[in-house]
């Protein structure tokens, strides 16, 4: 329906903790549609409601073109002891990426757009994306998963790119 403005890092809205969704109605469907449109325009493979200034526990992923995955009130219920490293970034900090280490498999409980409870086991890149977006719903920007040295270097480059 609409491409919404994305909050740029380090906007305070990105560190807010998102509230659970309690009403599954047309407003929620409109939010999800706006998230999809905004994510595709960014472009990105995932986006949370927090990225557009809405502090609700909603995110969408598009890992395969044309296949949208919607997660409402997601919660990781278990994860593997095995980890993997993968390059991560954010629509709030376009063009800046680094490797982050996370569990390679997760089980997630969530609700779909109708409010129905779902569970899913995700592996590899899919698992990484779920963890990344749930972190954002909890106010944890992906940079916090880096060492202080890497984080400081990226933030300096980001600030310089915004204020040449």
UniProtKB/Swiss-Prot annotation:
Q: Which HAMAP family does the UniProt record give?
A: Pep_deformylase
NCBIfam families named among the record's database cross-references: pept_deformyl, PRK12846.1-5
Q: Name one GO biological process term.
A: translation
Entry annotation: catalytic residues: 133
- Give the Pfam families listed for this entry: Pep_deformylase
Instruction: Show the InterPro entries listed in the entry.
Output: Peptide_deformylase, Peptide_deformylase_sf
UniProt name for this protein: Peptide deformylase-like
Q: Which organism is it from?
A: Agrobacterium fabrum (strain C58 / ATCC 33970) (Agrobacterium tumefaciens (strain C58))
Q: Name one GO molecular function term.
A: peptide deformylase activity
> What family does this chain come from, according to its entry?
Belongs to the polypeptide deformylase family.
């Amino acid at each position: 329906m609409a491409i919404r403005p994305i909050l740029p890092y380090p906007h305070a809205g990105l560190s807010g903790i998102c509230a659970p969704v309690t009403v599954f109605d047309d407003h929620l469907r409109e939010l999800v549609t706006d998230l999809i449109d905004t994510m595709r325009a960014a472009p990105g493979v995932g986006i949370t409601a927090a990225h557009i200034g809405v502090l609700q526990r909603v995110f969408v992923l598009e890992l395969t073109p044309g296949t949208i995955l919607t997660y409402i009130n997601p919660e990781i219920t278990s994860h593997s002891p095995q980890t993997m490293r993968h390059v991560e970034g954010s629509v709030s900090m376009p063009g800046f990426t680094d490797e982050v280490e996370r569990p390679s498999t997760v089980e997630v409980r969530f609700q779909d757009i109708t409010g129905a409870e779902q569970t899913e086991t995700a592996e590899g890149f899919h698992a990484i994306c779920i963890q990344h977006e749930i972190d954002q719903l909890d106010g944890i920007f992906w940079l916090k998963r880096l060492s202080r040295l890497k984080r400081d270097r990226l933030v300096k480059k980001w600030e310089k790119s915004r204020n040449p």
